[in-house]
Swiss-Prot record:
UniProt keyword Cell cycle present: no
Protein name listed in UniProt: NADH-ubiquinone oxidoreductase chain 3
GO cellular component, as recorded: mitochondrial inner membrane; NADH dehydrogenase complex
Lineage: Eukaryota, Metazoa, Chordata, Craniata, Vertebrata
Enzyme class: translocase
Organism: Ceratotherium simum (White rhinoceros)
């Protein structure tokens, strides 16, 4: 009963906060708040300029490699396990996957900025 009450209260509170967050910004729409801010100066140009897909691809590549590196961080603690052979096999597979994905990005010219 206590668990159900806690889940209900947490779900209700989260739902109310999400509804308020979507409802409040629609009440007061100011042009000053909607305009871009450039360190106190008037904007030089439009803030809605399109950007090249290279930025997006570099960001996605960074996130993927960052995630794979984060998976390698617990390896020093995993080396203290009793089954060292399994840990080394998994680490080798993960490092091989990281190297293969880097080689794929390199061959597909995903790391080159100039076209």
């Amino acid at each position: 009963m206590n668990l159900m009450l806690t889940l209900f209260i947490n779900t209700s509170l989260a739902s109310v906060l999400v509804l308020i967050a979507f409802w409040l910004p629609q009440l007061n729409i100011y042009t000053e708040k909607a305009s871009p801010y450039e360190c106190g100066f008037d904007p030089m140009g439009s803030a809605r300029l399109p950007f090249t897909m290279k930025f997006f691809l570099v960001a996605i590549t960074f996130l993927l490699f960052d995630l794979e590196i984060a998976l390698l961080l617990p390896l020093p603690w995993a080396s203290q396990t009793t089954n060292l052979k399994t840990m080394l096999t998994m680490a080798l597979i993960l490092i091989s996957l990281l190297a293969a994905s880097l080689a794929y990005e390199w061959t597909q010219k995903g790391l080159e900025w100039a076209e």
